């Protein structure tokens, strides 16, 4: 797609996909319907996570309907669409040593970013400044955020998915930060809360320590074979 390359940059292309990824072969999307038609001829079903791409859903369903008629006539052909999510979830459940190392790197980098933001926080700082500190650290290490960062001061910290991050923090406020990074497709996810002026009030400290105790107890309960 020449136009897309001009606007958005180079495309891997069919040849690049076949060479750069652990797959048997690659084909153009323009040939998708023809390839699916051919593949369905001697298949009993189709594995597809639907509602991710309307165009692909339409092609598969159209081909499936056509081949189902063939099955009624000749006794061969697909009968259903199967959601492979449970199979893929099981495959993703156990990580390889190399995957674990990447996950550790992602977690370490996110932890670094949170620590830096804590040290640079003061009672006149704005939420977006904290966001910039954290995400800037991610980018300086060749990473990127794994989800839109949440930085809420005061009452904003009580909003579960607060993404505006556009208010200034006040003296005495607690700041909640939910931010993680992604390395090679593996994401970290860390939430921490700290006082804007560097010192908890008695009530803040009491609640903070209560939550901290609960978190430590939950971590200690994470053993092989433990139920959720």
Predicted features along the sequence, with ranges:
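Active-site neighborhoods and metal-handling regions in enzymes and metal-associated proteins
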Residues: 1-228
């Amino acid at each position: 797609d020449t136009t897309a390359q001009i606007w958005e940059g180079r495309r891997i292309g069919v040849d690049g996909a076949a060479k750069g990824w652990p797959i048997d072969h690659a084909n153009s999307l323009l040939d998708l319907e023809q390839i699916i038609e051919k593949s369905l001829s001697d298949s009993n079903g189709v594995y597809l996570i639907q509602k991710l791409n309307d165009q692909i859903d339409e092609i598969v369903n159209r081909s499936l309907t056509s081949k189902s008629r063939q099955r009624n006539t000749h006794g061969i052909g697909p009968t259903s669409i199967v959601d492979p999510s449970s199979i893929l979830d099981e495959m993703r459940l156990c990580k390889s040593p190399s995957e674990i190392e990447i996950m550790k790197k992602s977690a370490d980098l996110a932890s670094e970013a949170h620590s830096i933001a804590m040290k640079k926080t003061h009672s006149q700082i704005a939420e977006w400044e904290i966001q910039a500190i954290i995400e800037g650290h991610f980018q300086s290490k060749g990473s990127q955020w794994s989800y839109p960062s949440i930085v809420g001061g005061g009452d904003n910290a009580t909003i579960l998915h607060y993404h505006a991050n556009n208010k200034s923090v006040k003296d005495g406020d607690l700041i909640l930060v939910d931010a993680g990074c992604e390395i090679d497709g593996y994401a970290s996810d860390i939430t921490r809360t700290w006082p804007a002026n560097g010192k908890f009030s008695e009530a803040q400290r009491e609640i903070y320590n209560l939550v901290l105790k609960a978190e430590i107890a939950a971590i200690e309960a994470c053993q092989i074979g433990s139920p959720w």
